[in-house]
């Protein structure tokens, strides 16, 4: 919150008491974990109105669509004179979403005060820079990623609907570079060992350690928020909410 004191504004982070924001859980042993109903009021962070807002404003967010094979679609982009990067066509984005394709919104970490405050709690607890990534589908029978790994540790927050997950014992070594064509166990008939088999429901939170293989099995209309925690902390992100006097 903001407190007016003379000519200055003193800022105090809204400290969240959440079971997964506990360094003691991670200091000796790094394994996938789940906390049931651990995130109160999850739709304060993202809901279908905010999803529509982001896809109506692709100039300000990284918006993507997954194809039926679980790979990111390379949609045509246009370069407008006032913007420094290519922007996908909104009509194509909404057509894909309304057909039931899985969508992704990245660079969502400053969307609103609730998101900023949640990520500030992460960054004040752990040695990391965070973003928020939104995943979802508006129709049943959508597809998502196959078995894959990510560089940073990740917290998956189920916002709406349900998602079944497998998290595996296998990890990719830090010796291996992340590329646009990573090793895909599913395509190589590589059977992985399940460490965690779980279905997340609204308010549930799951932790996936760095470089650990994992795979979602989505069903039904759903929304989730991923919080990747890139370590170590590099440049602090200003998550304060300022006012104009």
Predicted regions and their residues:
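Active-site region of the double-stranded beta-helix
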Residues: 5-18, 23-26, 41-45, 52-53, ...
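Residue-level recognition of conserved beta-strand edge/terminus positions
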Residues: 207-209
């Amino acid at each position: 919150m903001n407190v007016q004191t003379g000519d200055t504004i003193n800022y105090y982070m809204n400290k969240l008491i959440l079971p997964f924001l506990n360094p003691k859980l991670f200091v000796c042993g790094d394994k996938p974990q789940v906390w049931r109903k651990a995130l109160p009021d999850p739709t304060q962070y993202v809901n279908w109105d905010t999803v529509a807002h982001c896809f109506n404003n692709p100039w300000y967010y990284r918006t993507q669509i997954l194809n039926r094979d679980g790979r990111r679609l390379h949609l045509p982009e246009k370069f407008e004179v006032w913007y420094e990067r290519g922007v996908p066509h909104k009509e194509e984005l909404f057509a894909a979403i309304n057909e039931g394709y899985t969508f992704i919104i990245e660079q969502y970490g400053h969307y609103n005060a609730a998101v900023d405050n949640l990520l500030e709690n992460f960054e004040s607890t752990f040695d990391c820079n965070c973003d928020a990534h939104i995943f979802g589908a508006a129709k049943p029978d959508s597809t998502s990623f196959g078995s894959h790994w990510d560089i940073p540790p990740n917290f998956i927050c189920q916002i709406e609907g349900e998602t079944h997950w497998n998290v595996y014992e296998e990890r990719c070594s830090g010796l291996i570079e992340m590329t646009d064509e990573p090793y895909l166990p599913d395509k190589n008939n590589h059977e992985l060992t399940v460490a965690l088999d779980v279905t997340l429901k609204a308010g549930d939170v799951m932790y996936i350690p760095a470089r650990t293989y994992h795979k979602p099995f989505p069903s039904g209309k759903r929304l989730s928020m991923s919080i990747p925690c890139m370590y170590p902390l590099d440049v602090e992100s200003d998550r304060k909410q300022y006012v104009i006097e």
